[in-house]
Amino acid sequence: MDFNLNDEQELFVAGIRELMASENWEAYFAECDRDSVYPERFVKALADMGIDSLLLPEEHGGLDAGFVTLAAVWMELGRLGAPTYVLYQLPGGFNTFLREGTQEQIDKIMAFRGTGKQMWNSAITEPGAGSDVGSLKTTYTRRNGKIYLNGSKCFITSSAYTPYIVVMARDGASPDKPVYTEWFVDMSKPGIKVTKLEKLGLRMDSCCEITFDDVELDEKDMFGREGNGFNRVKEEFDHERFLVALTNYGTAMCAFEDAARYANQRVQFGEAIGRFQLIQEKFAHMAIKLNSMKNMLYEAAWKADNGTITSGDAAMCKYFCANAAFEVVDSAMQVLGGVGIAGNHRISRFWRDLRVDRVSGGSDEMQILTLGRAVLKQYR
């Protein structure tokens, strides 16, 4: 098995290193995190490199580079301190549109490609429907040749500034036998109210409550086929969970390297603290977790490129990497001591971000349930 990157992948990784060294991005990220602002300038710089085209098919102007290349790029971005969680819609979000969306919907999204601006996101979660997606109450109702959307969504990421969202709703005409359908919604339509929510981490990507009060839609705004909503979002969930896991690894690697440099420089009791056995033990455990994450993610990326990845694989990556990465960052923060918990060290941001990832994108508990079912299914 060859673990070396090919020439194309090496070029992408080298380009990432060059970009991250081109200016003091960390100061920019710290400012965006403090003010809960989307880092549009950074995302635009990545789009200029073609990162938004990595998984896009060649016939649509993309690179069709594959998931292994995506993994290599994502890991390097994270290792160098980039908030890759703001990029979840860039590499693969286009592809569900190309398959499910109408040409008009595709054109609207593609108009934002390469701009660095947020383009779209899905709106599924509701106050009474988190992990239990089937309990959602938002409805669409047909009246006088129009469709009217009513209800509310909560904890919807990337929704403060995005021009379009894809809303999951149930048919109001069939309450006893729910029909779940997605709708492509222009956020400028009357009847939409967006309330930005504060959160512990992942602060560069907005989190909002959205209410719909008789928002008027047309049949052409249907996204995909009627009644097919759950099938599409299942694939989107798997895709998101893999990207979250990649982000977790990169962030943990960055924290690990920050702590290692500090341990070799910080002197206490007359010598570098990295010479103390208890500190060495922390780094041994961190290294084991990082290596396990990396191997798991590259295997999943290879499976994705070969069409064999499953929901169980995505759940395993999401659960293991979210937890292992948090443990790595927590240990790295312990090594840094007061430096890590006071002032403006980026590790405090990493700690907050990774704690959120054990809930967002699918809770730890739901990943365990998904994985357990998938494992036992293999032996039926």
Swiss-Prot record:
Keyword Nucleotide-binding: no
Cross-referenced SUPFAM superfamilies: Acyl-CoA dehydrogenase C-terminal domain-like, Acyl-CoA dehydrogenase NM domain-like
Cellular component terms (Gene Ontology): cytoplasm
Keyword Cytoplasm on entry: yes
Keywords from the named record: Cytoplasm, FAD, Flavoprotein, Oxidoreductase
One of the record's GO molecular function terms: flavin adenine dinucleotide binding
Subcellular location: Cytoplasm
CDD domains: ACAD
BP terms from Gene Ontology: carnitine metabolic process
Pathway: Amine and polyamine metabolism; carnitine metabolism
Record's catalysed reaction(s): 4-(trimethylamino)butanoyl-CoA + oxidized [electron-transfer flavoprotein] + H(+) = crotonobetainyl-CoA + reduced [electron-transfer flavoprotein]
EC number(s) recorded for this UniProt protein: 1.3.8.13
Main location: cytoplasm
Cofactor: FAD
EC category: oxidoreductase
Function: Catalyzes the reduction of crotonobetainyl-CoA to gamma-butyrobetainyl-CoA.
Assembly notes: Homotetramer.
Family the entry assigns: Belongs to the acyl-CoA dehydrogenase family.
PANTHER family from the UniProt entry: ACYL-COA DEHYDROGENASE (PTHR43884), ISOVALERYL-COA DEHYDROGENASE, MITOCHONDRIAL-RELATED (PTHR43884:SF12)
Protein name as catalogued: Crotonobetainyl-CoA reductase
Protein source organism: Escherichia coli O8 (strain IAI1)
Gene: caiA
